[in-house]
């Protein structure tokens, strides 16, 4: 039988003046107790033991329990709290030492402390409640949270650590100084939750955590919406992210599965996998990412299947010794390159479609940089569908490029292998090799190029067999400068341009064409022009010179004539000039850089 106790601030008939006195009375009688609390402000700390229910009478916030310092509610047993406002400072406002604790329609405010601390082996249920300023901590405990709000936490709004297991449904987290939810070496499930305004990752899984998210929304956060690190695992389904720095981040050995999620208007990246992180991303969409939509870097290795990238700058980037496997990816309407592989990275693209992007695939790096494309279609590009430079190695199988500037280009010391590929309706050419690059093609078809079909220039080597070049405006095949190679069983058809224009460094084996084949041996370079430099630093004399004054490099010359004073005549004599003293000419040369010998 449940005994009922009534608490009123000023006492009354059969009423207790404070909550603590009612708790003492219930403890003395033992058994289940229901304590009904009238509206008022109670400055006391509550210690609850046994099976007790505390219920506030009146509207929300009418029953306030707020001691000056310390814990507000210390619970051990089977405790239920309903309709109270608990306010504490510099301590755990609610501390569940063991047993079970349920908070319903309750508000907890922690000024400088923890809202709720669920300790090991306890079970805490939070329903229709609000938690402000402090974090809610499950340390080795079990818990369930439904329809709760977590506001303006000074650190993490909800922390699930040390093997705890917590399920969170239909709750909201906003304004946390660190994370909205942190799961560390524990298990947590978030269903239908909303997170906003966090200063770090809205949801963080670290230290081998297990995190499941379904139907959640994250917006307006300063860092990642969701972050998996340190070998954490989990499943994320139906996540909607907007206005985050990064949509989802994976690092340091973490390996989540992410499905059916949308990352929109991320300021930097949509999907970011780094530092040996992995992850499987299926049927996701990245919209208008500020920098890179899907980013694998520094040893990252994601698997991306059936995803769509729309708008933004760069579509998929695999850089800095990273890897990536991409299947069924659609990339469209970007302002930058669609696919990028740099710096000792390795990427595989299968059944991928690129539309309306300035460039298709861009590969650059040393010999450890590789890309493989199979069943890929690239259309509507402004530059090259495929561009390979450095020492990178790329293999194309059943790749089509249409309606752009250049189909396939390989330069410097890179290598490009082409098998069963098509290039059509390009403005500058079908395929080109330059520098000291190597292009090997089998069953390549180039149609409707406004310039050439195939070009080898500088010192490139081109090996093409069983290929067709149709209706190319300038030439089907052209070799310039020192470029060389061979054409085996190839055909050049059309009604315009030349069939083959070469430099004598290419082997033509079984060439089929009705168009002209022209050999143009490069003219030898003209001899070097002899350059004679004359240096005029002073006068040059070709014979003896006497009685001259010389000056050079002068900016100003001043000449002054000084007349001697007339001699006085004595009576009876006639004045006469003194020889050599009639007139004296003095030249003064005024130049800081001048010289007068």
Q: Residue locations for each model-derived region?
A:
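Right-handed parallel beta-helix/beta-solenoid
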Residues: 1-28
């Amino acid at each position: 039988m449940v005994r009922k106790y009534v608490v009123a601030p000023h006492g009354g008939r059969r009423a207790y003046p404070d909550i603590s006195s009612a708790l003492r009375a219930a403890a003395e009688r033992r058994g289940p107790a229901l304590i009904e609390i009238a509206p008022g402000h109670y400055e006391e700390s509550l210690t609850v033991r046994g099976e007790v229910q505390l219920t506030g009478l009146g509207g929300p916030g009418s029953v306030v329990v707020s001691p000056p310092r310390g814990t507000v509610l210390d619970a051990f047993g089977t405790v239920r709290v309903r309709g109270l406002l608990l306010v504490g400072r510099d301590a755990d406002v609610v501390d569940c030492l063991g047993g079970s604790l349920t908070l319903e329609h309750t508000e907890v405010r922690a000024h400088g402390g923890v809202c709720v601390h669920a300790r090991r082996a306890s079970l805490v249920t939070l329903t229709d409640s609000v938690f402000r300023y402090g974090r809610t901590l499950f340390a080795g405990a079990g818990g369930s949270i439904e329809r709760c709000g977590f506001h303006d936490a000074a650190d993490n709004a909800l922390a699930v650590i040390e093997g705890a297991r917590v399920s969170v449904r239909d709750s909201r987290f906003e304004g946390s100084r660190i994370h909205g939810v942190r799961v560390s070496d524990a298990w947590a499930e978030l269903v239908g939750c909303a997170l906003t305004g966090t200063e770090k990752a809205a949801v963080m899984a670290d230290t081998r955590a297990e995190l499941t998210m379904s139907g959640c929304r994250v917006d307006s956060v300063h860092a990642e919406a969701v972050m998996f690190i340190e070998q954490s695992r989990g499943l994320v389904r139906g996540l909607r992210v907007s206005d985050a720095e990064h949509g989802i981040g994976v690092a340091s050995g973490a390996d989540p599965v992410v499905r059916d999620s949308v990352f929109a208007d991320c300021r930097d990246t949509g999907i970011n996998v780094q530092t040996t992180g992995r992850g499987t991303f299926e049927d996701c969409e990245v919209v208008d990412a500020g920098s890179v939509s899907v980013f694998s870097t520094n040893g990252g290795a994601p698997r991306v299947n059936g995803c769509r990238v729309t708008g933004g700058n760069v579509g998929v980037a695999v850089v800095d010794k990273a890897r990536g496997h991409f299947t069924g990816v659609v990339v469209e309407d970007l302002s930058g390159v669609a696919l990028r592989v740099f710096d000792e990275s390795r990427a595989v693209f299968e059944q991928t479609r690129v539309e309306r992007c300035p460039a298709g695939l861009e590969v650059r790096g040393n010999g450890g940089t590789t890309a493989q494309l199979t069943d890929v279609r690239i259309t509507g590009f402004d530059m090259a569908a495929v561009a390979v430079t450095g020492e990178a190695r790329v293999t194309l199988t059943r790749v089509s490029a249409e309606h752009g500037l250049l189909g396939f280009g390989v330069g410097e010391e890179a290598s490009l292998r082409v098998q069963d590929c098509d290039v059509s309706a390009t403005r500058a050419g079908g395929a080109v090799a330059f520098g000291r690059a190597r292009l090997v093609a089998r069953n390549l078809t180039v149609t409707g190029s406004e310039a050439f079909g195939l070009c080898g220039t500088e010192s490139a080597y081109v090996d093409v067999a069983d290929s067709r070049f149709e209706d190319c405006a300038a030439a089907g095949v052209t070799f310039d400068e020192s470029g060389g190679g061979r054409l085996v069983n190839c055909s050049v058809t059309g009604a315009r341009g030349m069939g083959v224009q070469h430099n004598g460094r290419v082997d033509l084996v079984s060439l089929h064409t009705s168009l002209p084949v022209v050999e143009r041996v490069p003219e030898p370079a003209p001899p070097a022009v002899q350059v004679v430099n004359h240096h005029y630093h002073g006068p040059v004399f070709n014979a003896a010179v006497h009685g001259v004054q010389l000056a050079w490099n002068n900016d100003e010359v001043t000449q002054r004539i000084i007349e001697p004073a007339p001699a006085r005549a004595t009576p009876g004599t006639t004045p006469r000039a003194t020889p050599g003293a009639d007139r004296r000419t003095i030249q003064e040369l005024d130049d800081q850089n001048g010289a007068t010998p």
